[in-house]
């Protein structure tokens, strides 16, 4: 069964694409302004939508094998927003090797910094009274501190470069990575940024004495910070539709983490999200992604902006 839907985002005619649903007892929600009279026929039900009218429809679908819905969008972002998409493996971002490389290097850096403080390898001026009282830290001379400085310098640069690299890879392939892998890359970049900042505890005097290295790192830190801020821009779309009073009419368990991250950037760039997206950002209830599903919840607005709180 094929149903053609027409949507008006104020842009040229789209190239139709196909979304296939393979779920039973699926409920599909349509909430759009239609550009022409459209007859929506799914299973045994038929609904006529008037041209130019803003309509909200909940269509119960009983599927034996599959239902194909041809939607006017390219790529299939509208179809994904309606039917969702399961996450597909992406070892280049979330593979064991990538994760191990980030975590092991982070643990090594943290262990090295803590050891330097505990064993007196840090500059004496960096050890405060609270460090001595609570962590039994000891200050050392410059000669002893220099033994760790070269190793920490290399590890610090590694964290800065890997954080920038993984975000650059995510930005370069937005249509090829899912929401799950996009947020995974952003979190790894945040980890790299935090670990890099921890190394500066032992490098303060060195960077103060070597200005050219200082400005190189300031430039890298600024670039990573800007990239991290930009990476958060589309996350408000996690609250892309306001909750209706009749929350039982919405899809409760729709796979969502597999939707391409580029879909959210595309809506953000066009600045034509559903009219109620602004209301959704400030309402007590909204759509959100959690554990690979789309659901309804009345949690804090912070979850709409910070990915770490939405899974």
Swiss-Prot record:
<comment type="function">
    <text>Part of the gene cluster that mediates the biosynthesis of elsinochromes, pigments consisting of at least four interconvertible tautomers (A, B, C and D) that have a core phenolic quinone to which various side chains are attached and which play an important role in fungal pathogenesis. The non-reducing polyketide synthase PKS1 was proposed to iteratively catalyze decarboxylation between acetyl-CoA and malonyl-CoA subunits for polyketide chain elongation.</text>
</comment>
<dbReference type="GO" id="GO:0016020">
    <property type="term" value="C:membrane"/>
</dbReference>
<feature type="transmembrane region" description="Helical">
    <location>
        <begin position="183"/>
        <end position="203"/>
    </location>
</feature>
<dbReference type="InterPro" id="IPR053018">
    <property type="entry name" value="Elsinochrome_Biosynth-Asso"/>
</dbReference>
<keyword id="KW-0325">Glycoprotein</keyword>
<keyword id="KW-1133">Transmembrane helix</keyword>
<feature type="glycosylation site" description="N-linked (GlcNAc...) asparagine">
    <location>
        <position position="31"/>
    </location>
</feature>
<protein>
    <recommendedName>
        <fullName>Elsinochromes biosynthesis cluster protein HP1</fullName>
    </recommendedName>
</protein>
<feature type="transmembrane region" description="Helical">
    <location>
        <begin position="220"/>
        <end position="240"/>
    </location>
</feature>
<keyword id="KW-0472">Membrane</keyword>
<feature type="transmembrane region" description="Helical">
    <location>
        <begin position="96"/>
        <end position="116"/>
    </location>
</feature>
<feature type="transmembrane region" description="Helical">
    <location>
        <begin position="160"/>
        <end position="180"/>
    </location>
</feature>
<keyword id="KW-0812">Transmembrane</keyword>
